[in-house]
Amino acid sequence: MKALDKIREIVNKFSFNIREAQEIICHVLKIDKIQLYTENPEITSEQAHTIKSLIERRLKKEPLQYIIGECYFYNIKIKVGRGVLIPRPETEILVEQVLERQKLISNTGNRILDLCTGSGCIALAIGKNAPEFQIFGIDKSEKAVKYATENKALNNIKNVIFLVGDMFNPFKEKIFACITANPPYVKTDEISKLQPEIKNYEPLEALNGGEDGLNFYRKIIENAEKYLLNSGLIFLEIGQGQAKAVQNIALMSGFNVIEVVKDIAGIDRVMILQKSKSL
């Protein structure tokens, strides 16, 4: 059977998403979408068996990114699998905001700390686009740091170092010009309401932000001033409806709220804080 015929069969038989069917076929055949449509290769019986297995996994709601083993984030390839959070397009907004303030950050210093680094996507995207920075990505999950380290090698990015650790523990005080984080921010009692792809497959420790979803914001903001240089910045991804609560934590800790940036859906998504010179 030809590849395009196989895609039509999958879509019709399982009411399958056509884009996902294309990605699975391309993954198994080791071709891109242009080759898929220009060459329309024949599928061998062995490839058909592999495709069937991957389709069955997706029908069980396993995320496509885990099935294929990779995704793209800010134009870099990121390897992912069970035990590491899948990068979201919304998180690219945080990277954009850091890069827009590249000169401002450089005026303070050249070290950036990426907390809860996971796959390393934020640290690597910044590192690739701003080679003058030295970036440290930290996560308490050894599996996540293993993926992050592999992604560093995959993309040949030299100015990023990944470490296993709990928040700020490995670092000396007052050395960072900027802190970035996409921390766990889902309320504990809301995890059961998430899509099955998320709650049944992605690591809960990368999602669970505690009873009110704010545990990690408190840990980050309340400790950040000890590690930031004067006028240093914090870039935080936040969940829907959390802006006011996170802003209050920031103000109580002596940080100025510089901006809250919305995502494409109009939801507050990234909060930018600055360390007061008086801290």
Curated annotation (Swiss-Prot):
Q: Which GO terms describe its biological process?
A: methylation; translational termination
**Coiled coil where?**
none
Q: Name one GO molecular function term.
A: protein-(glutamine-N5) methyltransferase activity
Q: Which residues bind substrate?
A: N182, P183, P184, Y185
Q: Which Gene3D superfamilies match?
A: DNA helicase RuvA subunit, C-terminal domain, Vaccinia Virus protein VP39
Pfam families reported in the protein's UniProt record: MTS, PrmC_N
Protein's UniProt keywords contain S-adenosyl-L-methionine: yes
Residues given in the record as S-adenosyl-L-methionine binding sites: D139, N182
* InterPro entries in alphabetical order: HemK-like, N5-glutamine_MTase, PrmC_N, RF_methyltr_PrmC, SAM-dependent_MTases_sf, Small_mtfrase_dom
Q: What class of enzyme is it?
A: transferase
Source species, domain of life = Bacteria
In terms of CDD domains, this protein maps to: AdoMet_MTases
Catalysed reaction(s) here are: L-glutaminyl-[peptide chain release factor] + S-adenosyl-L-methionine = N(5)-methyl-L-glutaminyl-[peptide chain release factor] + S-adenosyl-L-homocysteine + H(+)
Under Enzyme Commission nomenclature, its number is 2.1.1.297
Keywords tagged on the record: Methyltransferase, S-adenosyl-L-methionine, Transferase
- Please give the SUPFAM superfamilies that the UniProt record associates with this protein: S-adenosyl-L-methionine-dependent methyltransferases
Function (record text): Methylates the class 1 translation termination release factors RF1/PrfA and RF2/PrfB on the glutamine residue of the universally conserved GGQ motif.
| Sequence similarity | Belongs to the protein N5-glutamine methyltransferase family. PrmC subfamily.
* Cited HAMAP family: RF_methyltr_PrmC
Name of this protein: Release factor glutamine methyltransferase
Source organism of the structure: Thermodesulfovibrio yellowstonii (strain ATCC 51303 / DSM 11347 / YP87)
Q: What gene codes for this chain?
A: prmC
